[in-house]
Structures are given as structure tokens and as C-alpha cells.
UniProtKB/Swiss-Prot annotation:
It is found in: Secreted. The lineage of its organism: Eukaryota, Metazoa, Ecdysozoa, Arthropoda, Chelicerata. The keyword Nucleus does not apply. Its main location: secreted. Belongs to the bradykinin-related peptide family. Causes constriction on isolated rat ileum preparations and relaxation on rat duodenum muscle preparations at amounts higher than bradykinin. Is a partial agonist bradykinin receptor B2 (BDKRB2). Is moderately lethal to honeybees. May be related to the predation of insects by the spider webs. One of its GO terms (cellular component) is extracellular region. This is Nephilakinin-1. It comes from Trichonephila clavipes (Golden silk orbweaver). Has been extracted from the spider web. One of its GO terms (molecular function) is toxin activity. Keywords: Amidation, G-protein coupled receptor impairing toxin, Secreted, Toxin. The modification Arginine amide is found at R10.
Length: 10
């Protein structure tokens, strides 16, 4: 993703 730690699949 664009940000480290951002997960669209949670």
C-alpha cells in the first residue's frame, strides 16, 4: 500500500 502498515485486507 501507499503507507507502511496499511493493510486493505484485514
Amino acid at each position: 500500500g501507499p503507507n507502511p502498515g496499511f493493510s486493505p485486507f484485514r
